[in-house]
Structures are given as C-alpha cells and as structure tokens.
Amino acid sequence: MPIITLPDGSQRQFAHSVSVMDVAADIGPGLAKACIAGRVNGELVDACELIEADASLAIITAKDEEGLDILRHSCAHLLGHAIKQLWPQTKMAIGPVIDNGFYYDVDLDRTLTDDDLAALEERMLALAAKDYDVIKKKVSWQEARDVFEARGETYKVEILDQNIARDDQPGLYHHEEYVDMCRGPHVPNMRHCHHFKLQKMSGAYWRGDSNNKMLQRIYGTAWADKKQLKGYLQRLEEASKRDHRKIGKQLDLYHMQEEAPGMVFWHNDGWTIFRELETFIRGKLKEYDYQEVKGPFMMDRVLWERSGHWEKYAQAMFTTQSENREYAIKPMNCPGHVQIFNQGLKSYRDLPLRMAEFGSCHRNEPSGSLHGLMRVRGFTQDDAHIFCTEEQIMEEVSACIRMVYDVYGTFGFENIVVKLSTRPEQRIGSDEAWDRAEAALAEALVLNGLKYDLQPGEGAFYGPKIEFTLHDCLDRAWQCGTVQLDFALPGRLGATYVGEDNERHVPVMIHRAILGSLERFIGILTEEYAGLFPTWLAPTQAVVMNITDNQADYAVKVAKALNDAGLRAKADLRNEKIGFKIREHTLKRVPFMLVCGDKEVEAGKIAVRTRKGADLGTYPVEELVALLTQEVQTRGQKKVEE
C-alpha cells in the first residue's frame, strides 16, 4: 500500500503498486492528459513507471523544463520513425536533446536535400497526428542487441557493445513499428509532440572522431505549444538579421579566410572597436588597482608540463620546435603570470597582487566548431589573476563582482544569471579549505545583493568558481565572466610569499575574466546592438555632408573640429544628392549625420540627424562638439538628444 507524497505535502494512499500516470489520473483527468513523466524520489522516470513503495512524486508536464527536454527527446525518436519509413536502409546513430531542440545523426546512402527535409517534416507531422502510444520495454542486454542486429542497426549494436554493461537492462521505446533505445524518460503518447520544426543539416563524424565515417546530422526544434514554437522561430529570424558575420561584412569590420581558419583579419573599423574596448577595460583596471603585464607568446613545453596544462590541454595547443626544444603557443595567460609573480621575494604586505593582461591566446579548436567571432582559434583574453591570502578571498571576489557588473552595465546588459559551482568528487585541498573558499564566494555574492544558482560538484578540481551568464535582447545566454579560485597552480609553479610568521606560504590564485575573449564579446555586441554600436564604440561617430560644392570647405572645417576634439568624424564631399548620402551612412550605422547647406554655413551651425531618422535640429558647431564629446566620454550616460 504505497503512500505517495506530492510536492505540496499532500499524500495519497493506494492499495497496490501504481504508475506515475495512475497517480496523475487519480488527481484529475486534466493532469493525466498533461502528464509526460514523473520525478520519483528525485529521479526522472517514465509515466508508465510503477511505484511499489512509499515515495515522493512530482508530475512532470510540458510546462516544466524537464518536460520540455523529454518532449524534444521524443521528437528525435519521431524523426527516427519518419526517416526509417521514407528511407528504410537508414542506420540510426544518436539523437540527443540540445538547447532549444534536438538532432539525430544518421547514416544514409544519399545526401539529404532541403526537399528531403521538408518531406521528412511532413511525415513526422503525419505520424504525430496519429497520437499513438509510445511503449517502453525493459529488456536484457542480449535481447536489445538481438533486436538491433536483426534490424541492421550497427551503430546501436556498437553502443551496446562499448557503452552498456552486460548486466544492464536497456530501455527500448516502440513507436509503432519503429524501435529506439534510450535511458528515457519519453512521452507516453505522441499527442505531446505536435509542435516542432526541422531546421538544418550538417555533417558529423561518428563519435566526433575524424577517423570515423561522416554521418548526416538533422537538427530540429520542438516546443510545448504553437505559440512557443512561433515565438522561437521569430527570434531565430531576428537573430539571423543580427548575425555578426553578416553585419561584420556589411560594416567592413573584419574577415576570415581559409588560409588562417579561426583567425581574425581585423579591418580598420573593426580594429577601432577592438581598441576602444581595450581602452575601456584598461581604464577599469586602473580604477580597480590592477597591474597590466605582458607575457610571452609561447613557452617551453616543460613549463606547461609543470603547470598541468600539457596533460589536460595538449591536444588543444599549437606547438613548434626550435633548437631541439618544444614550445607551446599559449592557450591561456595564467602560467605566465605566475612566472612574473615569482620574480623577487614577495611578502604578505605585497598581497593582494592583481595582475591583468590582454593576452593573445591560441587554441586548436576543431574546424567544425569554428563560428565567426564566437568560436575562434586565435583570441585575446581580458583575464586577470589575483594573488592573495585565504583571508583576502572574500574581499577580492567581492571587488571582482563589482567590476563585472560595472562593465556589463556600461553595455546595457542587465539580465545576468549567476552560478556558484562547488567542490567535485575528485579535488585537491582539504575539506576545511573548500568549506572556507565556498563560504567566501557565497558571502561575496550575498554582500553584493546577488541571487545565484548553486551547481553542486561542478567546480574545477582546483577550486570553486562563479560564472556570469549574460542574456541578450533575444534572451540568448552568453557565458562570459568567471571568478575561479585556484589552490593548485601557484604551488605547482613554485609561487610563495613570506607570511607574518616569517614562513613561506603558497598564495591563493583567483582567475578573473569579464569579457572573456574580446573577439567573442565584439560578436555578442554586434548582435545585441544589430550593428548600431553606441557612439563611443562606433568606428565613425559622425559624418559631415555638404549639399552642394559651396559648403565643401565648411564641411571639412566641421569634420576637423570634431577630429581635433578626439572624435572620429569624416567629411563626405561626393557630388551626390544629400538623401543618397544620408541613406548610405544610415546603412553603415553611423550615429550622427551632420548636414550643412548655405543657411548653416552662414549661421556657423550644423543640422543634426541620427541614424534612427530623428531630426535634432541645428547646433552651433562648438556646442555640438562639446555635446558629442560628453556623450563619448560618459559612454552614453549623457546623450546629445537629451
């Protein structure tokens, strides 16, 4: 007679074992219809799972995050069902859930086309409309292998042989005649899987190994209802318009080419944005009392072995040889900063020591993962390393948090999700040290009035960390900032200081990044602003345009006055209609278009228009220079139109 305890504390008693779906039906028909799965004693299970003893139970529906993931996973199985009907010789590989959707890797003797994708989606819709039950069967390992061997599913057989223990009982999910294997859970009925869209195809090596066969990967998205699906597709359309790769080309910011994959060729206007970001962060470094240093581009393999990076990151490091020595081009700045710290005897009075660098780093990312500025091989980190005592951790972390929010606020990012990752099972250091470190991070977050999500066990083996994830105007998440404690690296590389007791101690190291990579952050900003960079970041801040040749000298004079004040201005003296000029510079996202005709010349003024089409009237040149300068210097806190 199991007693089921529900999330609100209420209890229901049953005379015999019951399934999750039985409990949902006992509560009400509406909940039974919405039930996708259950969480029994904290574990996600299928709706058909029997509960035979007292247990806590939460009914999972599509309104829950887990429910949406289950729905998407079942849509991957639906894709498998459809593709096997259309092309029966297809061999199915894996079909996991990803952010906002799912994919399935398939081995097919034809290259799928866009027309094939449309036909596949149509078949999926027809199958889902049948609202058939999904039947789960737990079978022995051998029975599962026999099923897939008989069906010619060589990839499923390989998964069983290499990844599933012989004494395990795999779950087989039956979609009418189609059978797939999964841990689950999955939806009990396909009525939950009506709102999806197949999106694109790509190539993917089996098990991510380039030595294996290239499979075809089919991507899709799935949502709980029509409104959610429509909203997501609209956001995707808007994201496509904001794609930094398109805008970067339109605005002539940068380019990339095959001869240097994952490396950025910055053009003048893109490099202007890059340098402005550097200048901004450099000012913050001074404000928060950091030293700025510069480490070498590459260092001997021996140093990377001592730091531990060679063991963990060797495959991602570019290397070269000279005079029988092997060097690694740095993938990160921290070992170099420890070398700088080690020069000269350090006392506790020297701590905290805050060391920052705009470090040029390189990582050998897989070519298939490269994506514009968002995923590159050569990048510039804005990270810093703080050497401090254990007692100084909380205060230093708190200052890092203030700096992070100070910087993000300047760019208009207000929706920031904070996560605190605590000790993993495999770690170095005593439990007492971890207790103090985790408490210090949590206290720093509370001190700054921040709510945070706890991620137990997700910290690095060498220390807990805080992650800052930005949500942009399309509600996409970008993990940029980190504050990571490190108990390991200073000791591995021989960093010490003399304490008040005249004994040598190993300092705690705090890794701190705000933008992460400048390249990636420029990509994020390009999409966030849709290329409409704030005036202080805009490559060209103002264009002065004459109406006829009579005002050419005056236009040059106004542009010179702006440039002499430290602004970035150009004069457009082309023999084109003023409307044509305005449109062209609007498309180039220039913040201010300054127009001069005979009246403006005579009055010593200039007519001001914005890239958004607002007519701000006429200003004396000196006044406009002062107002634009103020907007740039305050980074938009005081704007011309105000």
Swiss-Prot record:
GO terms for molecular function: ATP binding; metal ion binding; threonine-tRNA ligase activity; tRNA binding. Zn(2+) binds at C334, H385, H511. Catalyzes the attachment of threonine to tRNA(Thr) in a two-step reaction: L-threonine is first activated by ATP to form Thr-AMP and then transferred to the acceptor end of tRNA(Thr). Also edits incorrectly charged L-seryl-tRNA(Thr). It is found in: Cytoplasm. Residues 243-534 are annotated as: Catalytic. SMART domains: tRNA_SAD (SM00863). SUPFAM superfamilies: Class II aaRS ABD-related (SSF52954), Class II aaRS and biotin synthetases (SSF55681), TGS-like (SSF81271), ThrRS/AlaRS common domain (SSF55186). Belongs to the class-II aminoacyl-tRNA synthetase family. InterPro entries: aa-tRNA-synt_IIb (IPR002314), aa-tRNA-synth_II (IPR006195), aa-tRNA-synth_II/BPL/LPL (IPR045864), Anticodon-bd (IPR004154), Anticodon-bd_dom_sf (IPR036621), Beta-grasp_dom_sf (IPR012675), TGS (IPR004095), TGS-like (IPR012676). One of its GO terms (biological process) is threonyl-tRNA aminoacylation. Keywords: Aminoacyl-tRNA synthetase, ATP-binding, Cytoplasm, Ligase, Metal-binding, Nucleotide-binding, Protein biosynthesis, RNA-binding, tRNA-binding, Zinc. Residues 1-61 form the TGS domain. It catalyses: tRNA(Thr) + L-threonine + ATP = L-threonyl-tRNA(Thr) + AMP + diphosphate + H(+). GO terms for cellular component: cytosol. Its EC number is 6.1.1.3. It comes from the Bacteria. The keyword Aminoacyl-tRNA synthetase applies. Homodimer. The gene is thrS. CDD domains: TGS_ThrRS, ThrRS_anticodon, ThrRS_core. It comes from Aeromonas salmonicida (strain A449). NCBIfam families: thrS. The lineage of its organism: Bacteria, Pseudomonadati, Pseudomonadota, Gammaproteobacteria, Aeromonadales. Its cofactor is Zn(2+). This is Threonine--tRNA ligase.
